[in-house]
Amino acid sequence: MVKRPIHRLTGESVVPEIDELAEEVIITIVSKDEIIVRILATPTDLEDLAIGHIICEGRGDIESLDVDGHEIEIVGNLIPRPSDDILTAACGACTTGEIVIPSGIAESTQKLRANIGEMMREMKENQPLFNLTGGVHAASIFDEDGRIIVTREDIGRHNAFDKAIGACHSIGFSPKIIGLSGRVGWELVAKAIRSKIEIIIAVGAISSAAEMLARSAGLTLVGFATKQNPAIIGDLSRIIDKPSTSRKD
């Protein structure tokens, strides 16, 4: 988060003030003096970002890492991206030469026994950076009872996903259920497959490519999760939606 001068329109007047903006910088991941990837991201939880990105993109194994400013050096066996372009906050497979479909989930092992609406409300309450700036996405990992294990924020929804997966790896938790603050596209389902996520619950819509990949891989997607009637795609047996225990908005 950074503070910058702006002008605020208030009715018919213009008022100068200082506003809080979501920070966006280039994060460089290197290994053996070679650039693995450069990512436009929010410079928080960078260790989680690096670990999660390598896991979610299937780019090798990490033995150790060191964060120095906006550069992360990794020791391990890593595969560089085919391009040295910078991954922007809106980018998933932008610089990939071809779309490679990851192998699917072998079997359904997860049951969600919680109210989806309450889960999304709790996720929203765990977004301090969004509350300050209004300019970042969030990803939360839940257990089967709908309790939040970790929440991570970033200006890029792909980065928030990576950070949440990386945080789980660091604490030794095997993530199966993820909540997302935005829409679900193909690349987020691909990340879910690579990180062994079985259920994606999203505030936004589900794209056609995401739907096709999720069905072929055996994932369960929930779209428009904050609405009264969420849309569910895939294996319904994973969702046991409990009645809400709190007042509806």
Name each region found by the language model.
Residues 128-171, 177:
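Histidine/lysine/aspartate-rich catalytic loop segments that bind and position anionic ligands
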